[in-house]
Swiss-Prot record:
Chief location category: cytoplasm
UniProt-listed HAMAP family: Methyltr_PrmA (MF_00735)
Presence of the UniProt keyword Chloroplast in the record: no
Function description: Methylates ribosomal protein L11.
GO molecular function: protein-lysine N-methyltransferase activity
Gene Ontology CC annotations of this record: cytosol
Organism encoding this protein: Legionella pneumophila subsp. pneumophila (strain Philadelphia 1 / ATCC 33152 / DSM 7513)
List of residues binding S-adenosyl-L-methionine: T142, G163, D185, N226
Pfam families: PrmA
Reactions that this protein is recorded to catalyse: L-lysyl-[protein] + 3 S-adenosyl-L-methionine = N(6),N(6),N(6)-trimethyl-L-lysyl-[protein] + 3 S-adenosyl-L-homocysteine + 3 H(+)
Compartment(s) where it occurs, according to its Swiss-Prot or TrEMBL record: Cytoplasm
EC number(s) stated in the UniProt entry for this protein: 2.1.1.-
Protein name according to UniProt: Ribosomal protein L11 methyltransferase
Family statement drawn from the similarity comment of this UniProt entry: Belongs to the methyltransferase superfamily. PrmA family.
Length: 289
Protein backbone atom coordinates (compact mmCIF):
# COMPACT_ATOMS: atom_id res chain seq x y z
CA UNK A 1 0.00 0.00 0.00
CA UNK A 2 1.04 3.58 -0.71
CA UNK A 3 -0.31 6.84 0.60
CA UNK A 4 -0.59 9.81 -1.75
CA UNK A 5 -0.88 13.34 -0.43
CA UNK A 6 -2.44 15.74 -2.95
CA UNK A 7 -1.76 19.43 -2.34
CA UNK A 8 -3.69 22.16 -4.18
CA UNK A 9 -3.75 25.99 -4.13
CA UNK A 10 0.04 26.14 -3.90
CA UNK A 11 1.57 29.61 -4.39
CA UNK A 12 4.19 29.30 -7.13
CA UNK A 13 6.81 31.06 -5.04
CA UNK A 14 6.38 28.45 -2.27
CA UNK A 15 6.54 25.26 -4.35
CA UNK A 16 10.24 24.60 -3.79
CA UNK A 17 9.85 25.24 -0.07
CA UNK A 18 6.86 22.88 0.15
CA UNK A 19 8.61 20.08 -1.75
CA UNK A 20 11.62 20.35 0.57
CA UNK A 21 9.32 20.01 3.59
CA UNK A 22 7.65 16.97 2.03
CA UNK A 23 11.04 15.32 1.54
CA UNK A 24 11.91 16.03 5.18
CA UNK A 25 8.65 14.33 6.18
CA UNK A 26 9.64 11.16 4.31
CA UNK A 27 8.09 11.53 0.85
CA UNK A 28 9.43 8.83 -1.49
CA UNK A 29 8.53 10.75 -4.65
CA UNK A 30 7.10 14.17 -5.47
CA UNK A 31 5.36 15.04 -8.73
CA UNK A 32 4.26 18.46 -9.99
CA UNK A 33 1.29 18.55 -12.38
CA UNK A 34 -0.73 21.30 -13.99
CA UNK A 35 -4.31 21.66 -12.81
CA UNK A 36 -5.45 22.87 -16.24
CA UNK A 37 -3.24 20.57 -18.36
CA UNK A 38 -1.29 23.47 -19.87
CA UNK A 39 2.18 22.80 -21.34
CA UNK A 40 5.15 23.81 -19.23
CA UNK A 41 6.43 27.05 -20.73
CA UNK A 42 9.96 28.40 -20.70
CA UNK A 43 9.71 31.67 -22.66
CA UNK A 44 13.17 32.96 -21.83
CA UNK A 45 16.44 31.08 -21.29
CA UNK A 46 17.13 30.54 -17.62
CA UNK A 47 13.59 31.15 -16.39
CA UNK A 48 11.86 28.63 -14.12
CA UNK A 49 9.08 26.78 -15.94
CA UNK A 50 5.87 26.97 -13.90
CA UNK A 51 2.22 26.46 -14.66
CA UNK A 52 -0.38 29.02 -13.55
CA UNK A 53 -1.73 26.56 -10.95
CA UNK A 54 0.31 23.60 -9.76
CA UNK A 55 -0.83 20.46 -7.97
CA UNK A 56 1.74 18.56 -5.88
CA UNK A 57 1.47 14.80 -5.38
CA UNK A 58 3.69 13.25 -2.70
CA UNK A 59 3.95 9.48 -2.22
CA UNK A 60 4.56 7.98 1.24
CA UNK A 61 5.08 4.41 2.44
CA UNK A 62 3.51 5.06 5.86
CA UNK A 63 0.13 6.62 6.65
CA UNK A 64 1.59 8.31 9.72
CA UNK A 65 4.21 10.11 7.61
CA UNK A 66 1.62 11.34 5.13
CA UNK A 67 -0.72 12.54 7.88
CA UNK A 68 2.11 14.32 9.69
CA UNK A 69 3.16 16.04 6.45
CA UNK A 70 -0.41 17.22 5.86
CA UNK A 71 -0.71 18.59 9.38
CA UNK A 72 2.60 20.43 9.13
CA UNK A 73 1.79 22.01 5.77
CA UNK A 74 -1.70 23.16 6.73
CA UNK A 75 -0.50 24.54 10.06
CA UNK A 76 1.96 26.81 8.25
CA UNK A 77 -0.25 27.57 5.24
CA UNK A 78 -3.99 27.35 5.99
CA UNK A 79 -4.88 28.20 2.38
CA UNK A 80 -3.51 24.87 1.13
CA UNK A 81 -6.00 22.13 0.30
CA UNK A 82 -4.51 18.73 1.22
CA UNK A 83 -6.19 15.38 0.63
CA UNK A 84 -4.91 11.89 1.41
CA UNK A 85 -5.53 8.86 -0.79
CA UNK A 86 -4.71 5.18 -0.35
CA UNK A 87 -3.15 3.58 -3.44
CA UNK A 88 -3.15 -0.18 -3.87
CA UNK A 89 0.03 -1.57 -5.47
CA UNK A 90 -1.84 -3.75 -7.92
CA UNK A 91 -4.20 -0.98 -9.08
CA UNK A 92 -1.30 1.45 -9.57
CA UNK A 93 0.66 -1.03 -11.67
CA UNK A 94 -2.39 -2.17 -13.64
CA UNK A 95 -3.37 1.37 -14.61
CA UNK A 96 0.13 2.07 -15.87
CA UNK A 97 0.33 -1.16 -17.86
CA UNK A 98 -3.07 -0.58 -19.47
CA UNK A 99 -1.92 2.82 -20.75
CA UNK A 100 1.22 1.51 -22.47
CA UNK A 101 0.45 -0.27 -25.74
CA UNK A 102 2.71 -1.13 -28.72
CA UNK A 103 3.41 1.93 -30.89
CA UNK A 104 4.81 2.19 -34.41
CA UNK A 105 7.14 4.98 -35.55
CA UNK A 106 7.74 5.38 -39.26
CA UNK A 107 7.54 2.22 -41.35
CA UNK A 108 9.55 -0.30 -39.38
CA UNK A 109 10.13 0.70 -35.74
CA UNK A 110 7.89 -0.58 -32.94
CA UNK A 111 8.15 0.24 -29.23
CA UNK A 112 6.55 -2.56 -27.23
CA UNK A 113 6.07 -3.18 -23.50
CA UNK A 114 7.69 -6.25 -21.99
CA UNK A 115 4.33 -7.82 -21.14
CA UNK A 116 2.87 -7.84 -24.69
CA UNK A 117 4.10 -9.66 -27.83
CA UNK A 118 5.29 -7.43 -30.71
CA UNK A 119 2.54 -6.97 -33.35
CA UNK A 120 5.12 -7.48 -36.15
CA UNK A 121 7.82 -9.92 -34.98
CA UNK A 122 9.97 -9.29 -38.08
CA UNK A 123 9.99 -5.50 -37.67
CA UNK A 124 12.53 -3.49 -35.64
CA UNK A 125 11.14 -4.06 -32.15
CA UNK A 126 12.28 -2.15 -29.09
CA UNK A 127 11.17 -3.77 -25.83
CA UNK A 128 10.65 -1.18 -23.12
CA UNK A 129 9.86 -1.32 -19.41
CA UNK A 130 10.17 2.35 -18.45
CA UNK A 131 8.87 2.34 -14.89
CA UNK A 132 6.83 5.30 -13.69
CA UNK A 133 9.43 8.01 -14.22
CA UNK A 134 10.66 7.98 -17.82
CA UNK A 135 9.52 8.12 -21.42
CA UNK A 136 7.68 5.43 -23.37
CA UNK A 137 7.35 7.19 -26.71
CA UNK A 138 3.88 8.60 -26.09
CA UNK A 139 5.01 12.23 -25.73
CA UNK A 140 5.14 14.22 -28.97
CA UNK A 141 8.83 15.11 -28.58
CA UNK A 142 9.85 11.47 -28.13
CA UNK A 143 7.68 10.51 -31.09
CA UNK A 144 9.36 13.18 -33.23
CA UNK A 145 12.80 11.86 -32.29
CA UNK A 146 11.92 8.21 -32.90
CA UNK A 147 10.36 8.99 -36.27
CA UNK A 148 13.44 10.97 -37.31
CA UNK A 149 15.77 8.15 -36.22
CA UNK A 150 13.68 5.60 -38.11
CA UNK A 151 14.17 7.37 -41.44
CA UNK A 152 17.83 8.36 -40.89
CA UNK A 153 20.86 6.44 -42.14
CA UNK A 154 22.46 5.37 -38.85
CA UNK A 155 24.60 2.52 -40.15
CA UNK A 156 28.05 2.52 -38.50
CA UNK A 157 27.33 5.91 -36.87
CA UNK A 158 28.42 6.90 -33.37
CA UNK A 159 25.71 8.82 -31.51
CA UNK A 160 25.22 10.70 -28.25
CA UNK A 161 21.76 10.58 -26.64
CA UNK A 162 21.95 13.62 -24.34
CA UNK A 163 19.33 13.33 -21.59
CA UNK A 164 18.60 9.66 -22.22
CA UNK A 165 15.77 9.12 -19.69
CA UNK A 166 14.58 5.54 -20.20
CA UNK A 167 17.14 5.04 -22.96
CA UNK A 168 14.43 4.80 -25.60
CA UNK A 169 16.29 6.88 -28.20
CA UNK A 170 19.64 5.19 -27.52
CA UNK A 171 18.23 1.70 -27.88
CA UNK A 172 16.18 2.62 -30.95
CA UNK A 173 19.29 4.03 -32.63
CA UNK A 174 21.21 0.81 -31.99
CA UNK A 175 18.33 -1.33 -33.27
CA UNK A 176 18.27 0.86 -36.38
CA UNK A 177 21.95 0.27 -37.16
CA UNK A 178 24.07 2.68 -35.10
CA UNK A 179 27.54 1.33 -34.32
CA UNK A 180 27.78 2.82 -30.82
CA UNK A 181 25.61 5.08 -28.67
CA UNK A 182 26.66 7.11 -25.64
CA UNK A 183 23.62 7.49 -23.37
CA UNK A 184 24.09 10.28 -20.84
CA UNK A 185 21.89 11.89 -18.21
CA UNK A 186 22.31 13.93 -15.03
CA UNK A 187 19.81 11.66 -13.22
CA UNK A 188 21.24 8.41 -11.88
CA UNK A 189 17.79 6.79 -11.98
CA UNK A 190 17.67 7.47 -15.72
CA UNK A 191 21.00 5.72 -16.17
CA UNK A 192 19.70 2.72 -14.21
CA UNK A 193 16.51 2.62 -16.30
CA UNK A 194 18.58 2.75 -19.49
CA UNK A 195 20.78 -0.11 -18.27
CA UNK A 196 17.73 -2.22 -17.44
CA UNK A 197 16.11 -1.59 -20.82
CA UNK A 198 19.40 -2.31 -22.60
CA UNK A 199 19.54 -5.70 -20.88
CA UNK A 200 15.95 -6.45 -21.93
CA UNK A 201 16.92 -5.75 -25.55
CA UNK A 202 20.18 -7.75 -25.44
CA UNK A 203 22.26 -4.62 -26.05
CA UNK A 204 25.93 -5.10 -25.15
CA UNK A 205 28.59 -2.77 -23.75
CA UNK A 206 30.28 -2.76 -27.15
CA UNK A 207 27.15 -1.06 -28.51
CA UNK A 208 26.14 1.21 -25.62
CA UNK A 209 27.98 3.32 -23.05
CA UNK A 210 25.93 4.73 -20.14
CA UNK A 211 27.32 7.57 -18.05
CA UNK A 212 26.97 11.09 -16.71
CA UNK A 213 27.62 13.81 -19.33
CA UNK A 214 31.05 14.66 -17.90
CA UNK A 215 32.42 11.37 -19.25
CA UNK A 216 31.89 12.38 -22.89
CA UNK A 217 35.16 12.89 -24.76
CA UNK A 218 35.13 11.48 -28.28
CA UNK A 219 33.58 13.28 -31.27
CA UNK A 220 30.54 11.59 -32.80
CA UNK A 221 28.51 11.65 -36.02
CA UNK A 222 25.26 12.69 -34.33
CA UNK A 223 23.98 14.20 -31.08
CA UNK A 224 20.28 13.88 -30.28
CA UNK A 225 18.95 15.85 -27.30
CA UNK A 226 15.32 15.82 -26.18
CA UNK A 227 15.54 18.36 -23.33
CA UNK A 228 14.26 21.86 -22.49
CA UNK A 229 15.20 25.11 -24.19
CA UNK A 230 17.46 26.56 -21.47
CA UNK A 231 19.79 23.54 -21.21
CA UNK A 232 19.85 23.23 -25.00
CA UNK A 233 21.09 26.81 -25.28
CA UNK A 234 23.61 26.42 -22.46
CA UNK A 235 25.03 23.26 -24.11
CA UNK A 236 25.72 24.89 -27.49
CA UNK A 237 29.50 25.02 -27.10
CA UNK A 238 29.62 21.54 -25.57
CA UNK A 239 27.68 20.10 -28.50
CA UNK A 240 29.95 21.95 -30.93
CA UNK A 241 33.01 20.37 -29.29
CA UNK A 242 31.52 16.90 -29.75
CA UNK A 243 30.49 17.35 -33.39
CA UNK A 244 33.00 17.80 -36.23
CA UNK A 245 32.08 20.03 -39.16
CA UNK A 246 29.12 18.61 -41.07
CA UNK A 247 27.96 16.31 -38.25
CA UNK A 248 24.32 16.44 -37.23
CA UNK A 249 22.60 17.76 -34.11
CA UNK A 250 18.93 16.88 -33.53
CA UNK A 251 17.06 18.73 -30.79
CA UNK A 252 13.56 18.42 -29.42
CA UNK A 253 11.77 19.17 -26.15
CA UNK A 254 10.81 22.70 -27.19
CA UNK A 255 7.53 24.26 -28.24
CA UNK A 256 6.88 25.49 -31.79
CA UNK A 257 7.13 29.12 -30.71
CA UNK A 258 10.48 28.47 -29.01
CA UNK A 259 12.12 27.08 -32.17
CA UNK A 260 13.27 30.50 -33.50
CA UNK A 261 14.98 31.21 -30.16
CA UNK A 262 17.09 28.06 -30.46
CA UNK A 263 17.88 28.64 -34.13
CA UNK A 264 19.12 32.15 -33.32
CA UNK A 265 21.13 30.95 -30.31
CA UNK A 266 22.87 28.24 -32.37
CA UNK A 267 23.56 30.38 -35.45
CA UNK A 268 27.26 30.96 -34.72
CA UNK A 269 28.03 27.24 -34.38
CA UNK A 270 25.35 25.34 -36.32
CA UNK A 271 23.39 25.59 -39.56
CA UNK A 272 19.66 24.89 -39.26
CA UNK A 273 18.58 22.50 -42.03
CA UNK A 274 15.17 21.06 -41.09
CA UNK A 275 12.18 21.38 -38.74
CA UNK A 276 9.39 18.95 -37.85
CA UNK A 277 6.29 19.70 -35.75
CA UNK A 278 3.92 17.53 -33.73
CA UNK A 279 1.12 18.61 -31.38
CA UNK A 280 2.65 22.02 -30.75
CA UNK A 281 6.19 20.69 -30.22
CA UNK A 282 9.16 20.93 -32.54
CA UNK A 283 12.21 18.96 -33.66
CA UNK A 284 15.12 20.90 -35.17
CA UNK A 285 17.98 19.45 -37.22
CA UNK A 286 21.33 21.25 -37.48
CA UNK A 287 24.75 20.61 -38.97
CA UNK A 288 27.91 21.68 -37.21
CA UNK A 289 29.88 24.55 -38.79
Amino acid sequence: MWFQLKIEHCPNDKIEEITEELEECGALSITLTDKNDNPVLEPEPGTTPLWPEVIIHALFAQAEEAQYAREQLVAKRPSLHCSLELLADKNWERAWMDDFRPQRFGNRLWVCPTWLPPPEPDAVNLILDPGLAFGTGTHATTSLCLTWLEQADLKNKSIIDYGCGSGILSLAAIKLGAKHVYAVDIDNQALQATQSNAHANHITESQLSISFPEALQNPVHLVIANILLAPLISLKERFHQLLPSGAHLVTSGILEEQAPLLIDAYDSAFTHIATEYCEGWSLLVFTSK
